[in-house]
């Protein structure tokens, strides 16, 4: 009850402060920031009680929410833009958290299930210690309700009525984040309660109008949040039994409910949920306009250098002459062992980066959203779920089975996104919302499988989910090479269509481009590319987001040049990540997917800042 009340009230307040129906502790990365802070405290050996745990989680949650709200444009941001910014920040923070779980398994033992949100982790002592904090924060938000109502009229109107907008917004965010982090401290991050509870109350407010005022909306959302959490807990006990049901995180059920809510919201939403003007950075330099081939050639040389460094460097350094002897079959046994494992890993990183970068470029173009990537459409998560199903249910799965599972998951996600958005002409904003819901559902089911499986399979799957090239060979390389070849051939034939699709919905139709068909084709190719890369090395984030942006900044928006440079930069990024993961803490290793998140998160923060600055001009 305490957790549901805190999350429901927190979500209602955040939506009021941000004037955004999709604002919530999940979508503003509050839960991810709090989770990372608590995990980091466990890594350094800090033994936190209830209230110190709240303080640590609060610091992480406030920092994450401040970054998302500040860099996405605050109240001026569209709902989809805010959610995309929060999702990307959440990906980065979650990847860092997962890296800590992999590197420090003993110090963080038990935090995986906690990170999914479980009610059976703390006794009444923790609840009694935190309850007064929740009550004080809750009452503070209720007292702030009238000012939140006035904020809904707009900043200028609120100021004219005597509201200190900046102070009201700051106090509202701090109290809402405090409630959310109290819940995180007790049970871990329980997903989407803060989104769904206010949504239910706002639906009721269409019949009971007083519920639209925050002094009633916040308590009503608290009640709805409590009902959601209790319903999820009862459902788990009914399905898995009174004993086993306690071991399954409650956040699994609430995340599934939230996923359904996002899909329903996408179907019923009007234009207000479409992305606002898709502001991008100035694309291309003077050199790119005069001689784009020179920039592309420089990118290829960079990739060659990265590949050579990846082959030569690692826990043991080899020379170019050693590689030549290995190719000629004259190397020593030691060199054979080193290069037989290292060269396929470098090749896997190269192909996976190229596949994910091309997939990201296609998704960003057809959705006309610079913050989109295959993960945003739920494809990456669904591919990961399909592969995890195979890993968990079979003792020694072949790569063919893992690839098949990933492909099935990715295709099902793509079909769901297409099916739900087909009636609206596959509008980009709806595609994004449905994709986010699909990804949330896939992540929830993945967590359920991992929690219910044995420790051996759980550790194996968690490591794979980090995105590792370890053990890569021909079975992994061939499907990626085939998928990349198909993607490159299609892109080469349709690059002019993509130039038109990125403009608006009208221009392509006027010039004879079948827009729904084009979106279907290119998202289908993105699904294939993502499935191949995910099956080979696991989920790798930010490549499909960062590489297309960097390519556009360097060489411009003409896809004839943008797509090849995107492929080159994506391949180089994952190769660098794999090299860093193999050498930074040798002989131990970090999965490449976690390193790309660490590299990609600062770049993405800078990107959001530049985009916001550009939108103000």
Describe each PLM feature range.
Residues 1-617:
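Alpha-helical transmembrane segments in inner-membrane proteins
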